């Protein structure tokens, strides 16, 4: 099996952007998140502003239209700052958004994806 993964400038920029965001906004509160067992809602808003919550969703449905590699890179950098936030992000992007994209019809996608 050949895993020839092509990393381009877009992926490099994404990695650096998410890493900086995570270091500044997630890492300083990671212990609090784990101790309190509570996810800070403001992080969802910020992740959305970065275009990460619908990273693999086509732009016509309100997403960023990026690859699964981009999703993986974002999750990796978020998880570097907080495994808890990384797991929440992964669940959102793979169990929720991805399933709507893959298994929903156009009407469901148009109604739902832009809001999550």
Model-predicted segments: where are they?
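Short N-terminal secondary-structure initiator segments
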Residues: 1-2, 17-20
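Intrinsic disorder at enzyme termini
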Residues: 1-10
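Glycine-rich flavin
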Residues: 13, 20, 25-113
């Amino acid at each position: 099996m050949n895993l020839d993964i092509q990393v381009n400038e877009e992926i490099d920029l994404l990695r650096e952007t998410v890493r900086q965001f995570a270091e500044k906004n997630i890492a300083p509160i990671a212990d609090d998140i784990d101790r309190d067992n509570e996810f800070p809602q403001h992080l969802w808003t910020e992740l959305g502003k970065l275009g990460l919550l619908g990273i693999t969703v086509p732009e016509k449905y309100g997403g960023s239209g990026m690859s699964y590699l981009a999703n993986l890179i974002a999750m990796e950098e978020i998880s570097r700052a907080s495994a808890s936030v990384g797991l929440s992000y992964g669940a959102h992007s793979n169990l929720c958004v991805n399933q709507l994209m893959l298994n929903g019809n156009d009407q469901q996608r148009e109604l739902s994806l832009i809001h999550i």
